[in-house]
């Protein structure tokens, strides 16, 4: 399957979210293009985004209103992170309602979003919510801006962030993710500094060299939520303009090796930590996290194929 055939596969109408993003992000069609406008409209009628929106309560949330965070990964917080990848925005009233409900459910001290019940921020939540809300069209919202400022304030001075309280690590990618989504022209000098140092943290480790080899980082998965793999790293670093850095070579070679002969990429896993001690813990607990499944494991993935092609497109392949 030649590249054009793969692109045609992504443009099939069964998943208009993928079609819309392929037209706009890979083929660089403007929003005024008739095919782009038709695909954007179709996103609300059929496919993953339409199914998500149809499952909401009238109030704009999923599941139990008492917790937008649990159960993982089926409740409001996790659904919104995925919905942000599916080509919908705040101009749709139902989406805007869910965004407002979501933001009110995670207030951050000082006026941002991503806080817990006490308003205390957690890097993974703040970064993820900021990134998703920017994709929904809230880049001018003061709450999103405050969240970005919080990410600047809480970054490690040497570069990177800590999501687990164990020091900066590759799993803590969400801060870079937020700034990768935020228009470059709006970055402040402090944002630029944090991005440059954060990117260097990943690059000096070649996106994977930290501690013992960790198998989940080499499995491409979706939904990403707050987990890391090398495709997540490549997507971030190339989107931030580091595609020509030679320290991406290992990760790019892995991306090329994982590509099927027909030009597509398989979904390696729904949830990356399904083995070892963490996997045993998940299976031993009756209230364990339930992965949110969009595509079949071991089969060609439209979402991963689009992301893989976007990475290669940014480096001129």
Language-model segments: what does each one mean?
Residues 1-317:
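Preference for long, amphipathic alpha-helical scaffolds in soluble/luminal domains
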């Amino acid at each position: 399957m030649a590249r054009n055939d793969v692109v045609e596969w992504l443009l099939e109408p069964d998943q208009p979210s993928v079609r819309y993003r392929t037209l706009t992000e890979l083929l660089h069609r403007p929003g005024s293009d008739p095919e782009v406008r038709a695909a954007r409209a179709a996103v609300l009628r059929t496919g993953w985004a339409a199914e998500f929106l149809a499952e909401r309560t009238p109030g704009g949330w999923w599941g139990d209103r008492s917790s937008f965070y649990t159960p993982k990964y089926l409740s409001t917080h996790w659904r919104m992170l995925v919905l942000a990848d599916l080509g919908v925005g705040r101009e749709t009233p139902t989406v805007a309602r869910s965004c407002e409900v979501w933001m009110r459910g995670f207030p951050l001290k000082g006026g941002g979003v991503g806080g817990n019940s006490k308003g205390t921020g957690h890097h993974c939540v703040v970064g993820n919510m900021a990134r998703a809300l920017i994709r929904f069209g809230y880049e001018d919202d003061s709450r999103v801006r405050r969240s970005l400022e919080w990410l600047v304030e809480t970054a490690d001075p040497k570069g990177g962030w800590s999501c687990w309280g164990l020091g900066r690590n590759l799993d803590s990618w969400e801060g870079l993710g937020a700034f990768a989504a935020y228009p470059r022209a709006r970055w402040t000098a402090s944002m630029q500094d944090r991005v440059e140092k954060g990117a260097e943290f990943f690059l000096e480790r070649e996106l994977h060299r930290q501690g013992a080899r960790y198998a989940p980082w080499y499995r491409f998965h979706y939904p990403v939520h707050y987990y890391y793999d090398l495709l997540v790293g490549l997507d971030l670093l190339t989107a931030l303009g580091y595609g020509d850095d030679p320290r991406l070579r290992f990760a790019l070679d892995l991306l090329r090796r994982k590509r099927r002969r027909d030009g597509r990429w398989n979904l390696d896993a729904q949830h990356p930590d399904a083995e070892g001690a963490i996997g045993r813990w998940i299976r031993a607990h009756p209230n364990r996290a339930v992965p949110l499944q969009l595509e079949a494991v071991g089969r060609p993935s439209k979402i991963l194929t689009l992301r893989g092609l976007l990475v290669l497109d940014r480096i001129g392949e």
